[in-house]
Amino acid sequence: MGEWLDQVYCEDTLQGITRLPDQSIDLIIADPPYGLGKDYGNDSDKLEAEAYLAWTQRWVDAVLPKLKPNGSFYIFLTWRYSPEIFVMLKQRMMMVNEIIWDRRVPSMGGSTRRFSSVHDTIGFFAKSKDYHFDLDAVRIPYDAETKKARSRSIFVGAKWLELGYNPKDVWSVSRLHREHRERADHPTQKPLEIIERMVKASCPANGVVLDPFMGSGTTAVAARRCNRHFVGFEMNPDYCRLIEQRLAALETSETA
């Protein structure tokens, strides 16, 4: 393993990605700016549609060679651009799932000319049909009542009742609010529950996860909690310091 392992570089992915050897990454989790004008401390979210899609293609083509032949790729998207980006990605990879993250936010106010948007779109892609996927690691336990009822069914084996069921492609996980303990100072921080599900399912033990847009560092935290390695890039110096703080706090809690 190289010196780049378990590092977050405070630089643009397009500049720093050459640090990584080709076919060295098991899983890529990308949460790029959505092109909606949010403030990330730079101009990364203020591109017009055509420029945004061209930029997306550039960074995708830069990171995909780093993925192993059996590697996987998850990308968070807004509905505004997911159709175009899915088409672009399907020209390069095999699409496994479209996942809907239901952020469990109340539908109040907003536009009176369209339905309220309360979800993010997640694309799950793989480099080949032999992609790594550990379903047992992310099964959801049945509750006692369901387990009792299904134990009488000839269609459900005892093993599957104990292991739990396959998560569906709609993930209802609350977005992070100020009262959540894991909340950090970042406008689009993703819940650990979601990132850890991706890591456990799609990265083998001791494998490597790449995050091209580290943000608050949730991917690094999830990888460490799941006994995987990580590497990533983040342009904002304030967020780089935040990532250091979160990883240090995790290390302290593990040794306490």
Can you describe what each PLM-predicted range is?
Residues M1-R241:
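Core catalytic lobe of class I
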Residues M1-W4, E244-A256:
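Short, conserved SAM-binding/catalytic segment
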